[in-house]
Amino acid sequence: MSRVQTVLGSITPNLLGRTLTHEHVALDFEHFYKPPPADFENELRQKIKMSTLGYVRLYPYSSRENLRFNDEEALEAVRQDVLLYKKHGGGAIVENSTYGLKPNLEFIVDLAKTTGVHFIAGTGHYIHATQDATHRNLTVEQMTDMYSKDILTGIDVNGRIVKCGFIGEVASVYPVQEFERHALLAAGEIQEVLGCGVSLHPHRVSKAPFEIMRLYLEAGGRANKCVMSHLDRTIFDMDELLEFAKLGCYLQYDLFGTESSYYQLNATVDMISDGQRIENIMKLINEGLVDRLLMSHDIHTKHRLTSYGGHGYHHIHMNILPRMFQRGVTLEQVEQMTVTNPANWLSFNA
């Protein structure tokens, strides 16, 4: 019988409800700090407030406070937003913070207990540059053992055994570093054995998703249990995206709510808007790919939380889905993307 492994235990897939497949509720993102423009340095060093919020929205990675997504203020703001998500019909959140991002399993478990939202935690490794010395020299065999234990045996969290429910996000740069290659191979090997879902994070060039899918597939991983994240900032050409879709993985648009065209982590491209995300998803639906589409926000900075003037985890449900309905997307298609596809991806033995 198929099951989904949440941080509070296994459940049947039909209990998930509408699911956000790529989010963070606690992590350390300070590795990605970018020095601010000299003229705005003072504003971006201050606490986030109305008089500085405009600067933070344009240069989110130049505010260290914005990147501290694990301090007391951030955790309380996250809690309030998860409650809003639940209030507006949210059922589950897939937490993608892995080794290198300092995930907080204790907080995730507490959120699951106190909000009624199902949380699925991931195992795996983020990019090489975020790892400490104890992880950087791990072999493929050591990684497979680690991921397997996190899923099958679980992790002791204050005396409670918490099991991870998927592998991800497994992240890499381009070209893929040796450490990252090990993580991709380990993910493919474990997926083949356990039948779990996998989520991959490509670098910010269009060739990257092709390269990491090749490594994952060569290791034995199944394409139909793999999600390619961040396609809305990676593959902009529809013909190239359709070519990539032939590999058979889930196609995820997971930066909903990011409306600034200036993308600080890759200034050579213009970030697309929510309207363009909807347009692209509709094109993919028309190509017969509705059963492989996923949507999320990838919230990982304070300024995207409602307490800091952001959109929160309920943005897709309250703002995006109504716009999709207005443009002709059917309820059946929305349910496929937000309920059925996440459940199929997260289900073991499916």
UniProtKB/Swiss-Prot annotation:
Transmembrane segments: none annotated. GO terms for biological process: catabolic process. A divalent metal cation 2 binds at E169, H201, H230. A divalent metal cation 1 binds at H22, H24, E169, D298. Keywords: Hydrolase, Metal-binding. PROSITE patterns: PHOSPHOTRIESTERASE_1, PHOSPHOTRIESTERASE_2. Binds 2 divalent metal cations per subunit. It holds the Pfam family PTE. It is an enzyme of class 3 (hydrolase). InterPro entries: AryldialkylPase_Zn-BS, Metal_Hydrolase, Phosphotriesterase. CDD domains: PTE. Its EC number is 3.1.-.-. GO terms for molecular function: hydrolase activity, acting on ester bonds; zinc ion binding. PANTHER family: PHOSPHOTRIESTERASE-RELATED (PTHR10819), PHOSPHOTRIESTERASE-RELATED PROTEIN (PTHR10819:SF3). Belongs to the metallo-dependent hydrolases superfamily. Phosphotriesterase family. This is Phosphotriesterase-related protein. It comes from Drosophila mojavensis (Fruit fly).
